[in-house]
């Protein structure tokens, strides 16, 4: 299969075999994957995001299931975003934290937090055995233009505060893409997942990037409801990006 990319050659796409769906336990899934050996992949990636694709490691994919179209690509038009009351409270609750953007280079501290997060969120699912190799393959890859947004407790005696969260973020000319976020489960009251997205939005606004891509939203899926709580949300229907009304947050 090929698609036209306004380059000298068309892009090759591969269709995976069916595999267990990561969202619905009673369904099978399959994906379309851009040719992982295409040397243009890094240059093509910004356009692929606009086509509804997403990155995992070095793979750029989008769901292509035979009997299901539940996964909807979504992004935030950051210039039009306004936090709701719950999101403003989240920002206020975490105003003591230190946020910085660093190179996408694994540290022992990040790896320890990642493994702790997976053991808490995905026990027995295979990912909880991830080590340094899997961290690099899944979150960094070989060609992506990624950065890590670190969220820490305040510094003590000139020493960095405890690492609470890392938001793996791809940077393109006109957008940011939220690849994966992991955080300490013990700080649930801080709503660090929401706080990380709010920080990514502010990052995109500061750098005058048009969008923050949030991956896929699934209507009616409890783990995806949080994405509808952000204003200025747009969904891709396969041809066009269209606005979605925000759902109210619940404190």
From Swiss-Prot:
GO terms for biological process: ubiquitin-dependent protein catabolic process via the N-end rule pathway. NCBIfam families: PRK01305.1-1, PRK01305.1-3, PRK01305.2-3. Pfam families: ATE_C, ATE_N. Functions in the N-end rule pathway of protein degradation where it conjugates Leu from its aminoacyl-tRNA to the N-termini of proteins containing an N-terminal aspartate or glutamate. It comes from Xanthomonas euvesicatoria pv. vesicatoria (strain 85-10). GO terms for molecular function: arginyl-tRNA--protein transferase activity; leucyl-tRNA--protein transferase activity. It is an enzyme of class 2 (transferase). This is Aspartate/glutamate leucyltransferase. It catalyses: N-terminal L-glutamyl-[protein] + L-leucyl-tRNA(Leu) = N-terminal L-leucyl-L-glutamyl-[protein] + tRNA(Leu) + H(+); N-terminal L-aspartyl-[protein] + L-leucyl-tRNA(Leu) = N-terminal L-leucyl-L-aspartyl-[protein] + tRNA(Leu) + H(+). Its EC number is 2.3.2.29. PANTHER family: ARGININE-TRNA-PROTEIN TRANSFERASE 1, ARGINYL-TRNA--PROTEIN TRANSFERASE 1. The keyword Transferase applies. One of its GO terms (cellular component) is cytoplasm. It comes from the Bacteria. Keywords: Acyltransferase, Cytoplasm, Transferase. It is found in: Cytoplasm. Belongs to the R-transferase family. Bpt subfamily.
């Amino acid at each position: 299969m090929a698609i036209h990319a306004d380059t000298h050659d068309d892009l090759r796409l591969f269709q995976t075999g069916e595999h267990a769906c990561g969202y619905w336990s009673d369904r099978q899934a399959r994906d379309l994957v851009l040719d992982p050996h295409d040397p243009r992949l890094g240059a093509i990636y910004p356009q692929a995001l606009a086509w509804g694709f997403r990155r995992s490691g070095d793979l750029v994919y989008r769901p292509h299931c035979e009997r299901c179209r539940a996964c909807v690509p979504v992004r935030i038009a950051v210039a039009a975003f306004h936090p709701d009351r719950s999101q403003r409270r989240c920002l206020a609750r975490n105003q003591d934290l230190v946020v910085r953007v660093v190179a996408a280079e694994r540290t022992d501290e990040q790896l320890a937090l990642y493994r702790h997060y997976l053991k808490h969120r995905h026990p027995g699912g295979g990912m909880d055995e991830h080590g340094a190799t899997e961290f690099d393959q899944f979150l960094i890859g070989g060609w992506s233009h990624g950065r890590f947004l670190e969220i820490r407790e305040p510094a003590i005696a000139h020493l960095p505060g405890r690492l609470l969260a890392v938001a793996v973020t791809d940077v393109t000319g006109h957008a940011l893409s939220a690849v994966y976020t992991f955080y300490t489960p013990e700080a649930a009251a801080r709503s660090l997942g929401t706080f990380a997205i709010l920080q990514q939005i502010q990052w995109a606004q500061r750098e005058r990037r048009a969008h923050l891509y949030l991956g896929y939203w699934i209507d009616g899926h409890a783990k995806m409801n949080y994405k509808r709580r952000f204003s200025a949300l747009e969904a891709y229907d396969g041809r066009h990006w269209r606005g979605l009304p925000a759902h109210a947050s619940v404190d």
